[in-house]
Amino acid sequence: MLYVKNLEKSYYIGKTEYPVLKGVNLHVAQGEFVAVMGPSGSGKTTLLNCISCYIPYDKGIITLGGEKLGNMDETSLAKIRNEKLGFVFQDFMLLDGLTIRENILIPRIIKGTVGKDGENLADQLIRLFGIEHIQHKFPAEVSGGERQRTAVARSLINNPLLLLADEPTGNLDSKSSRNVIESFEEARTQLGATIFMVTHDAFSASFCDRVILLKDGRIYKQLEKQGERSIFHSQLLDVLKEMSNDD
């Protein structure tokens, strides 16, 4: 599904180069739920931005569904973002003047592709994420967790190949965070969604199939969940402590 090979990205201040990604290699299989963790400045968000085609990368290859990303004109990149990628951000990015249901449908409304299929998929997502009772309310009338579940539903309304999530629980309390992560799990198990999530939260990451740990622009370690989630959570905390002690 997603392949990243020898990815490099630097930023420049004046003539000084600051490497951020230093030869990153990874893959995400179809239907897999993968998290990326690491300390501030490790390259997590830059990696996500390269995969999402929002910033160019310097060297390497990124392919999604067999199609090479990068070195395209803006029209082609926008088409990939609109048709093959779904996005969930820390800030919910909902339109205050639209209802919850309308916010979920907005990607199809913009493209003029709502139709019966779009309405049926919206119904399915609304049921799946338990937001039937708020679908005709406005964002200001619902909780933060409900707004984020709405954002997850919106990200899936175009049946993307890959859902990208950047700190999706960063603005939520622990109960709402769990509800949102469980929404991702439901999307994966019920819809076959493929999810790539950047997070600083080991609890959220423990729901994933696999966690990639970045440090100083390189992959430090990868952990795969092989048993109970609580055990995986403890393993993640141990590795994060190990990373901190290596500084």
Where are these regions (language model features)?
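Conserved beta-strand-loop-alpha-helix hinge in the C-terminal portion
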Residues: 218-242
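Short acidic DE-rich linear segments
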Residues: 246-247
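ABC family nucleotide-binding domain
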Residues: 2, 7-207, 214
